Every structure is written in structure tokens, then in C-alpha cells.
Amino acid sequence: MRTLWIMAVLLVGVEGSLFELGKMILQETGKNPAKSYGAYGCNCGVLGRGKPKDATDRCCYVHKCCYKKLTGCDPKKDRYSYSWKDKTIVCGENNPCLKELCECDKAVAICLRENLGTYNKKYRYHLKPFCKKADPC
């Protein structure tokens, strides 16, 4: 359990319920979230920002933009619930903002799965200072 939490801290971002986000990414991609996406490209990970390097990195960019649109909850602190039914993520919140937060995380997990073919190991530990400024969300 502790290992999964540590992995989650290094995930696509520090925002959101990291435990749930990590589980979603693992369920959708089959990849270790911290190792595969914790510092991927210009947008995945804690310090992520910049012009996306590829479609995988673009998933992380869109995820950060999704978080910026949330109002009424704190993606850095608030937790949500979801279930995994028939290999599908189902967000199960009554609170509209927490449901949107869950949907943001669901979208990035699905996007990463759909773009597994663009995953490039050379971007796994990409140095963020070399990233160019991205367009605003």
C-alpha cells in the first residue's frame, strides 16, 4: 500500500487524489504510473509545463488544463470515489466538482492508454528546463 502511495506522489501531477489517479493509470495502461509517467515529457509530473513533446505528453497537458477549469473543489486536496466495472472507470460522486475532478483523472488515464503507441522512452525523464512555453489552456 505504501509503495502505491509513493508511486502516486510522482504521477502525472501532484494534484487530485493521487492514489485514485495512480490506480486509474495502472488499470488503463498496465504501466507503473510513477516510473512511466512521473517525469515524462514536458507536462507529466510535478514540475510539468511546456509544449507537449508527443501525444502522450499532450495527455498530461490536457489534464492540467482540465484541473484549471474546476471550481468549488481543490484538486490538490480533495478525494473522490470511483469504481472499475467491466474494465471501465466509473466516477461515483454526487458532488459536481468532485465528479469533474474524477472525470479529469479518468480522461488522462484513458488518453494515456489510447496513446501507448506514442510513448517514447527518451522522454521518460525529460529535463523540464528544455521545454518551450506552451499555449495557454
Curated annotation (Swiss-Prot):
The annotated site for Cationic membrane-docking site (MDoS) falls at: 128, 133
What, per the annotation, is the impact of changing residue 123 to A?
Important decrease in myotoxicity when injected into mice. Important decrease in myoblast membrane permeabilizing activities. Important decrease in bactericidal activity
**Pfam families per the UniProt record, alphabetical:** Phospholip_A2_1
MF terms (GO), sorted A to Z: calcium ion binding; calcium-dependent phospholipase A2 activity; heparin binding; phospholipid binding; toxin activity
Consequence recorded when altering residue 125 to A: Important decrease in myotoxicity when injected into mice. Decrease in myoblast membrane permeabilizing activities. Decrease in bactericidal activity. Important decrease in calcium-independent damaging activity against EYPC:DPPG liposomes
Cite the SMART domains for this sequence: PA2c (SM00085)
Question: Got a GO cellular component term for this one?
Answer: extracellular region
Q: What is the effect of changing residue 58 to A?
A: No change in myotoxicity when injected into mice. No change in myoblast membrane permeabilizing activities. No change in bactericidal activity. Decrease in calcium-independent damaging activity against EYPC:DPPG liposomes
**Gene3D superfamilies, sorted:** Phospholipase A2 domain
Keyword Disulfide bond on this protein?
yes
Which cysteine-cysteine pairs are annotated as disulfide bonds in the entry?
A: 42-131, 44-60, 59-111, 65-137, 66-104, 73-97, 91-102
Q: Where is this site: Important residue of the cationic membrane-docking site (MDoS)?
A: 121, 124
Effect the entry attributes to changing residue 128 to A = Important decrease in myotoxicity when injected into mice. Important decrease in myoblast membrane permeabilizing activities. Important decrease in bactericidal activity
For this UniProt entry, which residues form the secretion signal? 1-16
GO BP of this protein: arachidonate secretion; defense response to bacterium; lipid catabolic process; negative regulation of T cell proliferation; phospholipid metabolic process
Q: Which domain of life is it from?
A: Eukaryota
**Consequence the record notes for mutating residue 124 to A:** Important decrease in myotoxicity when injected into mice. Decrease in myoblast membrane permeabilizing activities. Important decrease in bactericidal activity
Effect recorded for residue 54 to A: No change in myoblast membrane permeabilizing activities
Query: Per the entry, what modulates this protein's activity?
Result: Suramin inhibits both myotoxic and muscle-paralyzing activities. Chicoric acid inhibits myotoxic activity. Zinc ions inhibits the myotoxic activity and the neuromuscular blockade. Heparin inhibits myotoxic activity.
Tell me what the record says results from residue 133 to A: No change in myotoxicity when injected into mice. No change in myoblast membrane permeabilizing activities. Decrease in bactericidal activity. No change in calcium-independent damaging activity against EYPC:DPPG liposomes
* Expressed in which tissues: Expressed by the venom gland.
Q: What is the effect of changing residue 52 to A?
A: Important decrease in myotoxicity when injected into mice. Decrease in membrane permeabilization of cultured myoblasts. No change in bactericidal activity. No change in calcium-independent damaging activity against EYPC:DPPG liposomes
Which UniProt keywords are given for this protein, alphabetically ordered? Antibiotic, Antimicrobial, Disulfide bond, Heparin-binding, Myotoxin, Secreted, Signal, Toxin
Summary of the function given for this chain in its UniProt record: Snake venom phospholipase A2 homolog that lacks enzymatic activity. Shows local myotoxic activity. Induces inflammation, since it induces edema and leukocytes infiltration. In addition, it induces NLRP3 NLRP3, ASC (PYCARD), caspase-1 (CASP1), and IL-1beta (IL1B) gene expression in the gastrocnemius muscle, showing that it is able to activate NLRP3 inflammasome. It also damages artificial and myoblast membranes by a calcium-independent mechanism, has bactericidal activity, and induces neuromuscular blockade.
> What name is this protein filed under?
Basic phospholipase A2 homolog bothropstoxin-I
